[in-house]
Amino acid sequence: MAWPAARVETFSRLLAVELGNHGIRVICLRSDAIPDAIPLSYTQGMFDDMTRRFGTTTEAWLEQHAKQDTLLGRLPRLEQVADYAAFVASDRAGAMTGALANLTCGSVLD
């Protein structure tokens, strides 16, 4: 997943350059898997297929991933990502653009 993420991050920075002088801010939100959002999205099938090949369930894999692969021992909640998105869209973050917000609970370090 590193290459697709890097492409999205680079694209967001290019958008910030192109749109900044029009007063448009661009902030890229990088999150890890969001367990409470998975059942609501197309990713449920992707996770189910992957974990079935590993001989486990999506829920068990997410729990293990959170404990072993994140610094905080958990994964981000949808509410946390939404709260941050609302903040960076607000005037309180009006000076911010061309930035990457790492909301991975420490699974990816910048």
PLM regions and their residue ranges:
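The catalytic Tyr-X3-Lys active-site helix of short-chain dehydrogenase/reductase
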Residues: 1-7
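Hydrophobic alpha-helix immediately C-terminal to the catalytic Tyr-X-X-X-Lys motif of short-chain
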Residues: 7-15, 19, 29, 88
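Short, small/polar-rich loop/turn modules that mediate ligand/substrate recognition or access, typified
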Residues: 20, 25, 96-98
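A glycine/serine/threonine-rich, flexible loop-to-helix segment
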Residues: 21, 34-69, 80
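Conserved SDR Rossmann-fold cofactor-binding beta-strand/turn motif
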Residues: 25-35, 89, 102-104
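Short C-terminal tail/terminal secondary-structure segment
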Residues: 74, 86, 93-110
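Non-catalytic, hydrophobic alpha-helical segments
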Residues: 81-84, 88
